């Protein structure tokens, strides 16, 4: 069991006094994640801007755990909470999107994907329509190479600006990001703060039409009005995760307040009172049943983080829990 956030802040008394951002101890992560479930952050820090974030990183000893989140769209937080500091980049300091030349946009890491799509439309830049259908933020899109409708983030990235654990600035090229399917090999210790994107000049009517098609498809096949973290598992080579989940009889499967959506069975939803334990147990149950049915190992696309409550544990799949 972790100590209180107040106790952690007391240990660092004086180190953080010059920060302009907001420090909040013992903040429920259920308030900032789309699943609306999970335990508290020991301390939540919302920096004012990149300079404030750098000062924070320089002040906090490296042995204290630190986790960065964006808008919380693909996070599953365990019920025991998240020890150390959770850094949440705010829209005010990290959410701007601006056109910097004829074909380029610069976006803050806290900008919603949809805002980038809208800015690209306004600038007459094609190649960003897929962001209109991704329920997340740019920082997460950079970290996991988010994609949809056959397009991926890596196709648009020129360079990424980041801070390391010591608060120093790094600029990473597209190659430095080490992109693969739903993955970047950039150091997990780097905190992305902004990105320079490259688009292709296009007709606004064509771009708007492509965005409308993305939105229509999403609303038709995905549970957009539910408390969900988006796609639960990555697609496996040669097949889609939802097909394997469906074949294993897991469409609509429930554990406590968690359910695999009837509309799209690769979407896990909180039906109202799910705990983090419910959600993760459901996911591992699905993985086990899919493996038993087809021999395919599904890999989580949703990021799981935090501590289990005392006495709780979840076995990894491979038939151990079913």
Curated annotation (Swiss-Prot):
Cofactor: FAD
Catalytic activity, EC: 1.3.1.98
Domain of life: Bacteria
Keywords, ordered alphabetically: Cell cycle, Cell division, Cell shape, Cell wall biogenesis/degradation, Cytoplasm, FAD, Flavoprotein, NADP, Oxidoreductase, Peptidoglycan synthesis
Subcellular location: Cytoplasm
Presence of keyword Cell division: yes
Pathway: Cell wall biogenesis; peptidoglycan biosynthesis
GO molecular function list: FAD binding; UDP-N-acetylmuramate dehydrogenase activity
Protein name: UDP-N-acetylenolpyruvoylglucosamine reductase
Gene: murB
NCBIfam families assigned: murB, PRK13905.1
Entry keyword Oxidoreductase: yes
GO biological processes: cell division; cell wall organization; peptidoglycan biosynthetic process; regulation of cell shape
Organism: Brucella abortus (strain 2308)
Catalytic reactions on record: UDP-N-acetyl-alpha-D-muramate + NADP(+) = UDP-N-acetyl-3-O-(1-carboxyvinyl)-alpha-D-glucosamine + NADPH + H(+)
Function: Cell wall formation.
Gene Ontology CC, one term: cytosol
Enzyme class, UniProt record, top EC level: oxidoreductase
Annotated FAD-binding PCMH-type domain residues: 36-202
Short name of any one Pfam family annotated for the protein: FAD_binding_4
């Amino acid at each position: 069991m972790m100590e209180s956030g107040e106790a952690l802040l007391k240990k660092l008394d004086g180190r953080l006094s010059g920060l302009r951002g907001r420090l909040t101890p013992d903040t429920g992560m259920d308030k900032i994640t789309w699943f609306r479930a999970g335990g508290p952050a020991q301390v939540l820090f919302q920096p004012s801007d990149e300079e404030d974030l750098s000062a924070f990183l320089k002040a906090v000893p490296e042995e204290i755990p630190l986790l960065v989140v964006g808008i919380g769209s693909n996070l599953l937080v365990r019920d025991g909470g998240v020890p150390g500091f959770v850094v949440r980049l705010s829209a005010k300091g990290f959410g701007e999107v601006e056109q910097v030349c004829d074909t380029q946009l610069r976006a803050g890491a806290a900008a919603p994907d949809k805002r980038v799509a809208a800015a690209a439309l306004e600038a007459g830049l094609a190649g960003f329509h897929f962001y209109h259908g991704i329920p997340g933020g740019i920082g997460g899109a950079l970290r996991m190479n988010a994609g949809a409708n056959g397009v991926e983030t890596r196709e648009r990235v020129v360079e990424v600006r980041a801070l390391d654990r010591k608060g120093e600035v790094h600029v990473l090229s597209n190659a430095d990001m080490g992109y693969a399917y739903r993955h970047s090999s950039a150091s997990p210790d780097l905190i992305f703060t902004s990105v320079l994107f490259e688009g292709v000049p296009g007709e606004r009517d064509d771009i708007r039409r492509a965005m409308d098609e993305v939105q229509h498809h999403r609303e038709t096949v995905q549970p957009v009005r539910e408390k969900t973290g988006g796609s639960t598992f990555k697609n496996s080579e040669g097949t889609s995760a939802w097909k394997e989940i469906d074949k294993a009889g897991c469409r609509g499967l429930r554990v406590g307040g968690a359910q695999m959506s009837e509309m799209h069975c690769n979407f896990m939803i909180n039906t109202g009172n799910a705990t983090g334990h419910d959600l993760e147990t459901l996911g591992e149950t699905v993985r086990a049943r899919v493996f038993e049915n087809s021999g395919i190992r599904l890999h989580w696309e949703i990021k799981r983080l935090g501590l289990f409550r005392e006495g709780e544990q979840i076995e990894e799949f491979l038939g151990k829990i079913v």
